[in-house]
Amino acid sequence: AAIVKSFKDDSNMFCFSLYLNKDFNFSKRYNSPTKLVPLNHDDKTIKWDWHKHYFDFGNPFLLESSVFLKSDFKKLSSKCQFNDIDDLEADLQKFNTFPKFVMSCFKENVKKEDIKETYQP
């Protein structure tokens, strides 16, 4: 229940990344080193301000690996024009000042199978 807990515990929570973790230090997408500066953490997750980060830690709109509240995502995506997932990711970039500033991820890598069994509400 770590994903659900992250959203319930923080009204500024915008996105939970299934891709990132505390050891992620190089962005293949941007071919550049990257660094996480956490706001806080618990035994399973880390939170950070995505507005203050670059590359992957500053981009909640990597849709293949992100979890959002349905209400937030519906609000944003309804204001986008797109034909496919790549178009949607690109158009969502216009919301890079969205007021919910917290992203979160698991501290350690978690297998997809474990997320389905353990963390799905």
Predicted segments, located by residue:
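Accessible peptide chain termini
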Residues: A1-A2, P121
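Alpha-helical elements of Rossmann-like donor-binding domains used by nucleotide-donor carbohydrate transfer enzymes
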Residues: A2-S6, D91-K94
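Conserved catalytic core of nucleotide-sugar-dependent glycosyltransferases
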Residues: I3-Q81
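C-terminal catalytic/acceptor-binding lobe
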Residues: S71-P121
